[in-house]
């Protein structure tokens, strides 16, 4: 049996982090967590691209452009969509989730969903480092692991093996 899995070595990986300015009280903490996680695991500053966008819906356009560039080993999408009094929360939360899933199905680059969808600001802050850990840090760990898994899958299954059957 062959088991293939990623690891947490970030040396040499190129990671993009897409983060909205909307709900900056939360998203800035998510970004801090993501950058901390990436750097602690060896991703160098010059290999991290932070893309600031107005809000979470703009991540869809930004993801497409970053994927078209083809230079990143993984992309992290951060954000904080907090329920309000209107249906807007549902639209944004659903569309960004669907878009990330769709890009993951159609792209060779792993995209990590680090968008908080909460009922209250307090819940969002708790998940951005207050009580429930930092989901930005967790997203960074997933990005590193998936970028390495991508490389291992390519190496193990796409590159020709010298002792493979002809």
From Swiss-Prot:
Gene3D superfamilies tied to this protein: Lumazine/riboflavin synthase
BP terms from Gene Ontology: riboflavin biosynthetic process
Protein name: 6,7-dimethyl-8-ribityllumazine synthase
Reaction equations catalysed: (2S)-2-hydroxy-3-oxobutyl phosphate + 5-amino-6-(D-ribitylamino)uracil = 6,7-dimethyl-8-(1-D-ribityl)lumazine + phosphate + 2 H2O + H(+)
GO CC field: cytosol; riboflavin synthase complex
Signal peptide per UniProt: none
A family per Pfam: DMRL_synthase
Record's function text: Catalyzes the formation of 6,7-dimethyl-8-ribityllumazine by condensation of 5-amino-6-(D-ribitylamino)uracil with 3,4-dihydroxy-2-butanone 4-phosphate. This is the penultimate step in the biosynthesis of riboflavin.
Active site feature: 88 (proton donor)
EC code(s) of this entry: 2.5.1.78
